Design a protein with these regions (language model features):
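Non-heme Fe(II)-dependent double-stranded beta-helix
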Residues: 1-16, 21-115, 121-122, 236-238
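Short, charged/polar surface micro-motifs in flexible loops or helix N-caps
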Residues: 82, 107-110, 137-141, 153, ...
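Generic beta-strand structural signal
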Residues: 93-95, 99-100, 111-113, 128-134, ...
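Short, structured patches in soluble enzyme cores that scaffold and shape functional sites
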Residues: 101, 117, 134-138, 147-149
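Double-stranded beta-helix
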Residues: 140-208
Length: 270
């Protein structure tokens, strides 16, 4: 039975920029996705990156844009309820895939995911967007993501590399620096949830979020989806992920009408 999204859920997503969705995926979908993640780990793409230091006792690994080669990723994106849920939460008539992102933290990983927004790393502008963070392993509170409620309605913050804190995207000083949330936690309403396989967190690409290391294997698949008001915003720098040659095919300010970003809602299911 499809997961139920209430008016309260839609209101909370619009207000907070993050929402826990319990049991979004069936056990069979989770098992299939887990196999897909393991296959991606074994055969990473040229876009894969290690986001932890060599001295880290664990391993923080990520890879991007593999849906065209990974059948399990395709099934989650095109055959699960995720597109319908996205349409409801974004209040969008149409939903396109933006990209997929696999993130793995092995047991004992110390590297934190620092506070950041996702959208400043990207080549898009607009507010109808959503990311789904989908773990295939249990995630207790101490290893989960944290979100600053309502931060998607505020500033764009300067994106930096996770390890060296370099401004490789927007030029230094062109955007505000991310506030020091950990030193002033009382100023913020922080949202976080314990998750089981099958659960997901949906969040806006401008919502500030961060994550701890991990005391156990934590495999996550993220799906980034875009709605009606999203427009192409070519950058003068390499975005993350990069879409080589896209600016030659898709002008600035137009919808993301390109084969890399297929429409997944309304769905055409046989």
């Amino acid at each position: 039975m499809p997961v139920s999204i209430s008016e309260t859920d839609i209101e909370n997503y619009a207000k907070d920029g993050a929402l826990l969705i319990k049991n979004l995926f069936t056990p069979d979908e989770v098992s299939d996705l887990r196999e897909g993640i393991d296959a991606n780990i074994s055969h990473p793409s040229s876009r894969a990156k290690v986001a932890s230091n060599e001295s880290d006792p664990g391993w923080f690994f990520e890879d991007f844009c593999n849906w065209q080669e990974n059948s399990a990723f395709q099934r989650i994106i095109f055959e699960s309820d995720i597109s319908e849920v996205a349409a409801k939460l974004m209040c969008s008539e149409q939903v396109r895939l933006f990209h997929d992102h696999m993130l793995v933290k092995k047991t004992g990983t110390k590297q934190r995911t620092p506070w950041h927004q996702d959208q400043p790393y990207y080549n898009i502008e607009g507010m109808q967007n959503i990311s789904f963070w989908i773990p295939v392993d249990p995630v207790p509170l101490e290893w989960t993501l944290e979100f600053i409620a309502g931060s998607h309605q505020e500033n764009w913050y300067l994106p930096r590399t996770f390890l060296k804190k370099e401004a490789k995207w927007f030029p230094e000083g062109s955007l505000s620096d991310t506030p020091n949330i950990d030193e002033n936690p009382e100023k913020y309403r922080v949202l976080s949830w314990e998750l089981e396989p099958g659960d997901a967190v949906a969040f806006h690409m401008l919502t500030l979020h961060a994550g701890a290391g991990s005391g156990a294997l934590r495999r996550v698949f993220s799906v980034r989806l875009i709605g009606d008001d999203i427009r192409h915003a070519p950058r003068d720098w390499e975005t993350s992920p990069e879409f080589p040659g896209l600016s030659d095919q898709l002008p600035a300010g137009v919808p993301m009408d390109h084969e890399l970003f297929p429409v997944i809602w309304p769905a055409s299911r046989a």
